[in-house]
């Protein structure tokens, strides 16, 4: 069970809505993923009407919507987008994204922390996308963020857990859920993230651009379940030395 703020989710997989070939394919993939928490960019939906091609099927699917501020380059822009989302969708939940450089899409740590502190004070449930910086993640937690969402690698890069060493520190010190966001490229990346202690992963590009997004979404669902089950089962410790699983000499002694 994944608990963030006042909500609980059976699934530990968060999904996005971008890059799908059609809204129908998007919804089919989300259903196959089992995800109950779905992000959507405010710049991609018509907030004036709920029959928007992206928004309407998501509402019908019964998932929890997590609007994001993708496209914001400053704290002020992100705060403005957050209030638009709250007014239009009736939710205090927000994925905070501030990335001023369109080439790399790396989160701005200074603007993110500034916006997070203000938005928490204004009653938002803030889930910030951030770099895999243990100090920053702790500061975001201290100002009241409901979770932290450090990147595994740049958005859409499919590189996997390139920041693993820093993610391990973040997981160890966090008292709020840690959701690895960005860079997850194949289901094995998601399984590894859950095995190492992450509470959830957010996957969008890897599902949306697959040749078969629906089956890829199912694969991610199974991978997340496997990673979580493996962690809960108590994996054996790593060793530099070999440890025999069967007696090496007993059968020789028995035959003498």
From Swiss-Prot:
Its EC number is 2.8.1.10. GO terms for cellular component: cytoplasm. GO terms for molecular function: thiazole synthase activity. InterPro entries: Aldolase_TIM, Thiazole_synthase_ThiG, ThiG. Keywords: Cytoplasm, Schiff base, Thiamine biosynthesis, Transferase. Pathway: Cofactor biosynthesis; thiamine diphosphate biosynthesis. One of its GO terms (biological process) is thiamine diphosphate biosynthetic process. Its main location: cytoplasm. CDD domains: ThiG (cd04728). Catalyzes the rearrangement of 1-deoxy-D-xylulose 5-phosphate (DXP) to produce the thiazole phosphate moiety of thiamine. Sulfur is provided by the thiocarboxylate moiety of the carrier protein ThiS. In vitro, sulfur can be provided by H(2)S. This is Thiazole synthase. It comes from Shigella dysenteriae serotype 1 (strain Sd197). The gene is thiG.
């Amino acid at each position: 069970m994944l608990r963030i703020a006042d909500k609980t989710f059976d699934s530990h997989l968060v999904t996005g809505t971008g890059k799908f070939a059609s809204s129908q394919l998007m919804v089919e993939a989300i259903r196959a993923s089992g995800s109950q928490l779905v992000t959507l960019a405010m710049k991609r939906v018509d907030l004036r009407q709920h029959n928007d091609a992206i928004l309407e099927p998501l509402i019908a699917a019964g998932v929890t919507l997590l609007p994001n501020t993708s496209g914001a380059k400053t704290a002020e822009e992100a705060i403005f987008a957050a209030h638009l989302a709250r007014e239009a969708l009736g939710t205090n939940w927000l994925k905070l994204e501030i990335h001023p450089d369109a080439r790399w899409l790396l989160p701005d740590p200074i603007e993110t922390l500034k916006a997070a502190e203000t938005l928490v004070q204004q009653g938002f449930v803030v889930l910030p996308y951030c770099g895999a910086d243990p100090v920053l993640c702790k500061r975001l937690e201290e100002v009241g963020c409901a979770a932290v969402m450090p990147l595994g690698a740049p958005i859409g890069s499919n590189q996997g857990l390139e920041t693993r060493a820093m993610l391990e520190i973040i997981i160890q010190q966090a008292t709020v859920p840690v959701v690895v966001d960005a860079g997850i490229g194949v289901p094995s990346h998601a399984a590894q993230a859950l095995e190492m202690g992450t509470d959830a992963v957010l996957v969008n590009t890897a599902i949306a651009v697959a040749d078969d997004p629906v089956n890829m979404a199912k694969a991610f669902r199974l991978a997340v379940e496997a990673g979580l089950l493996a962690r809960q089962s108590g994996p054996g410790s790593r060793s530099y030395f070999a440890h025999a699983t069967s007696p090496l000499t007993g059968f020789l002694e028995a035959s003498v």
